[in-house]
């Protein structure tokens, strides 16, 4: 998906690019409107993957992974499906998402909110970036590999 902001006659020009097969979404508004949509969209999609990273890894470490999976399958099956399909795709992208999460924090700060939440999400993606590469089948395998990466991380005492 490619977000571009345009208004007036420029919106019509961008809209015509759809005829060439490009997935263009015109966002009405001034400069920065499309970037704001992109940041808010990524906050939800990539933020959910960061939450799922910590939730599944923590559940695994605490011995309640199967109970979490059962609860999600019953009450929020779409979340379980998103985690099982999405988390295995995250590690090769994590290094790129760190700066994006920091940018989301700055965007939210400009809207009057604390940037702390997405600075912490950037830290989650730093941890994910330390995972060993290789295929993963679901959220449970992802969690185990993330926990292994956390175990290998050097500490301040090293």
What positions do the PLM features span?
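Short, small-residue-biased leader/transition segments that mark boundaries at the very start
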Residues: 1-2
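Electropositive, surface-exposed helix/loop patches at the edges of structured domains
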Residues: 22-31, 102-116, 151-157
């Amino acid at each position: 998906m490619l977000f571009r902001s345009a208004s007036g006659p420029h919106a019509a020009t961008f809209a015509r690019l759809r005829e060439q097969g490009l997935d263009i979404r015109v966002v009405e508004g001034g400069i920065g409107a499309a970037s704001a949509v992109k940041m808010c969209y990524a906050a939800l999609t990539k933020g959910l993957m960061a939450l799922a990273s910590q939730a599944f890894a923590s559940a695994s470490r605490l011995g309640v992974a199967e109970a979490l999976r059962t609860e999600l399958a019953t009450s929020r099956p779409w979340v379980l499906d998103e985690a099982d399909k999405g988390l295995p795709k995250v590690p090769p992208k994590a290094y790129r998402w760190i700066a994006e999460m920091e940018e989301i924090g700055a965007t939210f700060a400009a809207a009057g909110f604390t940037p702390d939440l997405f600075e912490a999400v950037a830290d989650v993606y730093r941890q994910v970036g330390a995972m060993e590469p290789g295929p993963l089948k679901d959220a449970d395998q992802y969690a185990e590999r993330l926990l292994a990466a956390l175990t290998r991380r050097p500490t301040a005492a090293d």
